[in-house]
A protein has these predicted regions:
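Alpha-helical transmembrane segments of integral membrane proteins
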Residues: 89-94, 98-122, 138, 154, ...
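An internal, D/E-rich "acidic patch" concept
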Residues: 43-108
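Generic alpha-helical secondary structure signal
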Residues: 32, 46, 50-54, 80, ...
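Membrane-water interface segments at the C-terminal ends of transmembrane alpha-helices
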Residues: 2-9, 128-160, 188-194
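Short hydrophobic, aromatic-rich alpha-helical segments embedded in or entering the lipid bilayer
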Residues: 28-62, 262-274
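Hydrophobic alpha-helical transmembrane segments of membrane transport/permease proteins
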Residues: 1-49, 153-174
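Hydrophobic alpha-helical transmembrane segments
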Residues: 31-45, 76, 127-136, 184-190, ...
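A short secondary-structure junction motif
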Residues: 13, 58-62, 66, 251, ...
Length: 317
């Protein structure tokens, strides 16, 4: 219900947006045509009726008709929500999933190293890079990398495919082309997240390394690597596991600004256009999906915390 209400808050509706767009093109829409469009799309009904129909249709697998008019479509209302999402969902999950894997694979070892080698040259270097990654805006980093890739590596920038493979069916060559374009958005999307996770891991591990049980184990001659990995890391990683709650929705939404700057065919620009054009069915379903994934992600993070840290138990009295 909250997702549906949020989409209904702006003044006007998708037909009004369509009328404004056609007026700018010099092709005004008559009042009769606008009324027929509203009746066809069900926008002339009361809000509670539209909500009940929306829920009922979704339960039957009908997500509705998209109102968007992007990228050369001749007329609006010509694609269903399923068709719009099918074009973007797979690429969004692939890009964000790849970014998350790279981020965690790099951030956790670096955070452990920085804590174990506190005040070393490597610690200072990674600390500087971490703060720089948090300070530089994603869209600015994207623009810089696009220039570097085009000027020094002679690589086409913008999007995830070259022009020859954009509309081509999937093949090994298309996958190679995707991988060659994937590094720029992966670096841009992963920089701030990697820097943040490095700082969290380092600070948490430093807190654990100063506790009495670690000092006692070190005094008894425990091996340094075993001493760090066996207990302090398992405790210090708990806050990182808690971030799984927002990792799942990020697989769908991605970064809207970065996707627009890099012209990525992901869900971010679709969600932005849907909100701007008041595409109630498309935007409402995406927001609903993000909310459901947030709840599922939070549940998964709680379960993982209970498995990783034996001190956490969910019991009833």
């Amino acid at each position: 219900m909250l997702a549906f209400v949020i989409i209904q808050l702006p003044e006007g509706d998708a037909v009004d947006k369509h009328i404004d767009r056609m007026l700018q093109l010099g092709d005004p829409v008559s009042v009769g045509t606008a009324d027929r469009l509203r009746k066809h799309l069900g926008l002339d009904r009361p809000m509670h009726t539209r909500y009940l129909l929306w829920i009922w249709n979704m339960a039957q697998g009908d997500l509705g008709t998209s109102f968007l008019l992007p990228f050369g479509w001749s007329t609006p209302f010509e694609q269903t929500v399923k068709e719009v999402l099918a074009d973007r969902l797979l690429l969004t999950v692939a890009l964000t999933g790849f970014t998350v894997v790279v981020t965690w694979t790099f951030a956790i070892p670096v955070g452990i190293y920085s804590a174990a080698r506190q005040h070393s040259v490597g610690d200072y270097v990674f600390t500087f890079l971490g703060f720089s990654g948090l300070a530089v805006p994603d869209f600015l980093l994207g623009l810089v990398l696009m220039y570097v890739a085009f000027a020094y590596f002679d690589q086409s920038v913008g999007g995830l495919f070259s022009a020859d493979y954009t509309a081509a069916p999937w093949s090994i060559a298309k996958v190679r082309d995707l991988l060659s374009h994937l590094w720029i958005p992966a670096v841009v999307l992963g920089t701030s997240g990697t820097a943040s996770l490095i700082r969290i891991m380092r600070n948490n591990l430093l807190d654990e390394l100063g506790k009495p049980y670690v000092v006692t184990a070190r005094a008894k001659g425990a091996h340094p690597i075993r001493l760090i990995i066996k207990y302090p890391v398992r405790v210090a990683i708990n806050p990182l596991i808690s971030t799984v709650g927002y990792l799942l929705p990020s697989l769908i939404s991605g970064s809207v600004i970065v996707s627009v700057v890099l012209s990525l065919p992901t869900m971010g620009p679709i969600l932005l256009n849907a909100v701007i054009q008041q595409d109630v069915f498309l935007a409402g379903f995406i927001i609903l999906m993000l909310g459901v994934l947030t709840i599922i992600g939070t549940l998964i993070s709680d379960i993982l915390l209970a498995l990783v840290d034996p001190r956490i138990k969910y019991t009833t009295n």
